C-alpha cells in the first residue's frame, strides 16, 4: 500500500521485452528497500526483482502492460517512485494500492 506522495523520480536505464513480460531497470536514489519490495512506479505497484547500487529492476506482466501506460515506457523515460507504506509511517496523502483493475479513455478536456 502507498500514500500517493511521490518520494523520488527514477529514469528507465534499460528495457528487456519477452513474450511473457517486460523488464525495466530504473536508476534511482531510493534507499532502504530489498529485493521483493513493492515500489509504486508512476502509480503502478511493481516488485523489485534485482537491486544494484543506484538501480533496481522490476518485471511488468502482460496483464499490467495491457491495463496501464507502462506498455509505452522506454529507455530514458522518467517515472515517479514511492516505496510501500510501513506501519508507523506518516500518511500525508491517501491510501493507494497500485493494482490497476481497468483503464478509461479521456474523451474531452474543457478549458
Language model features with spans:
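Conserved loop->alpha-helix
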Residues: 1-111
Amino acid at each position: 500500500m502507498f500514500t500517493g506522495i511521490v518520494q523520488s523520480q527514477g529514469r528507465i536505464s534499460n528495457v528487456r521485452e519477452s513474450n511473457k513480460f517486460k523488464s525495466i531497470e530504473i536508476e534511482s536514489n531510493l534507499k532502504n528497500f530489498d529485493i521483493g519490495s513493492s515500489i509504486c512506479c508512476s502509480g503502478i505497484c511493481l516488485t523489485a526483482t534485482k537491486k544494484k547500487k543506484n538501480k533496481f529492476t522490476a518485471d511488468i506482466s502482460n496483464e499490467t502492460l495491457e491495463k496501464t501506460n507502462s506498455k509505452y515506457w522506454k529507455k530514458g523515460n522518467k517515472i515517479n517512485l514511492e516505496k510501500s507504506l510501513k506501519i508507523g509511517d506518516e500518511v500525508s496523502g491517501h491510501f493507494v494500492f497500485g493494482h490497476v483493475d481497468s483503464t478509461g479513455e479521456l474523451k474531452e478536456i474543457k478549458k
